[in-house]
Amino acid sequence: MSNTSLLICASQCWPAQPDTTANSLNRLLAQQALQRSGWRGRLLLTLLHLRCGRVLLGGLLDLSLPGIMAHYHWRKQHIASWVQQHIEQQRIQQLIVVGAGFDGLGATLSAKYKHLQVIEIDRSATISVKLAALHKLNALSPNLCMKAADLSCSSLQQLLAETAEFFPDRATLVLAEGVLMYLAQPAINAMLQQLRQSVAAPLYLIATQMQLAPCGRPRFFKQRWLADMALMLSDEPFV
């Protein structure tokens, strides 16, 4: 699991979150993902369960990405709200989540909206861990489809064409949260063009983007050298 995925899972397990149904599934899914992600995941989960461990993690985050936990909480809360607004107001029948990671939004929405076909796309290792976790939590709805693909080197259009659960004539919402900063501009352009060519019905997009630093590369506003080092060591640089 990448350092970014570990951090996002940690944000879902942080005790300060409100106890809603969606947050509960996100927390349980994140815990399962950390347990299945080697020694780093298990160590992080242990630290999160201890008050002194959370103090230590909070200190490290203040030295690397101050405010990142609050950012993740705010972002996920508002994205979930925007997605549900689109589903209900635009009569969305299909949700494609690009780079779904270990987020529980797709599982939550597929259970809530039985008419909604949800297709989650991520790398094979992530999909494998997430499928096992959802099975254990009994949270895998029939209208939730998970597809393994590396979109930095594969065609989204071909993947969708080969997916029996994909319906090109359904009003579709695409969610790309925390994905675009890992793709070069030509890859982003190709992905958007392939989506437009794949869907014959109304198509909507909700995506996150990062501001560019003076060097011209994506970067968090308060990103410090410790975060730079972690991204470099885990081979997940923003492009």
Where in the sequence are the language-model features?
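Rossmann-like AdoMet
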Residues: 1-96, 102-147
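Glycine-rich phosphate-binding loop signature in dinucleotide/nucleotide-binding domains
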Residues: 86-91, 163-172, 199
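Short, conserved loop/helix-junction motifs that constitute active-site signature segments
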Residues: 109-115, 166-168, 197-200
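S-adenosyl-L-methionine
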Residues: 133-168
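A short, conserved alpha-helix within the catalytic core of class I
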Residues: 146, 155-159, 182-197
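A short SAM/SAH-binding and catalytic strip from SAM-dependent methyltransferases
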Residues: 161, 166-187
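Conserved beta-strand signature within the Rossmann-like core of class I S-adenosyl-L-methionine
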Residues: 173, 192, 197-214
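Short alpha-helix
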Residues: 233-239
